[in-house]
């Protein structure tokens, strides 16, 4: 319960932060850690158009908050892909990756996508 209250508070703060976007020019994909403790890790990602991220995996579920939305194409290690359309100001749940799988993310749009990611370190 305590963890969910903390997560709800963090999400509320992050949604407020999403209203004020950085005016800096983005030249490459960035991942900036915002906060980390024993329960969660929070980072901001700025994903430039058409530049695939390296293959990686997520062991735990996470919430994505779109600060600047767009369409993210997610390609798994077998070549299967799916698209996620993230609207600015909205939050989305992404479950942990299946055991033994990896994926790469590609911004399918023409503008950078900015998201805040809140990843749980313990699923239960």
Model-derived segments and their meaning:
Residues 35-39, 78-97:
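Short acidic-glycine-tyrosine-enriched beta hairpin
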Residues 1-4:
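Positively charged n-region of N-terminal signal peptides that target proteins for export
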Residues 28-54, 59-64, 117-118:
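A short glycine-rich, His/Asp/Glu-containing loop-to-beta-strand
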């Amino acid at each position: 319960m305590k963890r969910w209250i903390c997560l709800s508070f963090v999400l509320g703060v992050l949604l407020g932060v999403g209203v004020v976007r950085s005016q800096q020019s983005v030249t490459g994909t960035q991942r900036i850690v915002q906060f980390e403790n024993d329960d969660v890790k929070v980072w901001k990602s700025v994903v430039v158009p058409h530049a695939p991220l390296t293959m990686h995996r997520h062991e735990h579920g996470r919430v994505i908050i779109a600060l600047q939305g767009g369409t993210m194409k997610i390609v798994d290690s077998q070549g299967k892909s799916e698209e996620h359309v993230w609207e600015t100001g909205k939050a989305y749940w992404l479950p942990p990756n299946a055991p033994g799988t990896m994926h790469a993310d590609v911004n399918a749009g023409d503008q950078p996508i900015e998201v805040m990611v809140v990843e749980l370190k313990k699923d239960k």
